[in-house]
Design a protein with these regions (language model features):
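Membrane-helix boundary elements
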Residues: 8-48
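Structural signature of hydrophobic alpha-helical transmembrane segments
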Residues: 47-59, 79-81, 106-108
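Hydrophobic, membrane-inserted alpha-helices
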Residues: 60-64, 85-93
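Terminal transmembrane helical module of multi-pass membrane proteins
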Residues: 121-134
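Alpha-helical transmembrane segments and their membrane-interface exit regions
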Residues: 110-119
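C-terminal ends of transmembrane helices
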Residues: 62-74, 122
């Protein structure tokens, strides 16, 4: 069952955990703008990584994992259905909750949409290939 788990739920859960426990509903993105580290670059510039940047990076990595799993055919119907549920939850939360009205959460919504779309596209491709049509 762990293999049928949409890994983008991790980004969704992490975002919500932070937004609803550490965030301020009147300024939802303030907590995600906080710096969590910085790196001095060879050019002399300082690259600062915020909490929001880290969540976006995690989301992109998890989206890659999801698409690779779908392309390998290892994804199950349960995984696709849970991905659709995740997208629905993300879309509704983005529209209805002030804490979710941030650029970081929008990237999570977009990643879940891409995951669902890629799953459908790959399933259709496999089905048409199995029938011998192009």
């Amino acid at each position: 069952m762990l293999l049928a788990f949409p890994w983008l739920f991790l980004s969704f859960g992490l975002y919500n955990l932070i937004a609803f426990t550490k965030g301020d509903a009147s300024v939802p993105r303030a907590v995600f703008d906080q710096a969590i580290g910085s790196v001095s670059m060879a050019s002399g510039a300082v690259w600062t990584v915020s909490l929001g940047d880290a969540i976006v990076a995690l989301t992109i990595i998890l989206l890659f994992v999801e698409v690779v799993r779908s392309a390998r055919g290892a994804a199950s119907l349960v995984d696709h259905l849970l991905g659709i549920v995740l997208f629905a939850l993300c879309a509704v939360e983005f529209v209805l909750r002030r804490e979710a009205a941030t650029q970081v959460f929008f990237v999570i919504v977009l990643a879940s949409l891409i995951d669902v779309s890629a799953g459908f596209a790959l399933a259709v491709s496999r089905t048409s290939r199995g029938r011998g049509s192009r």
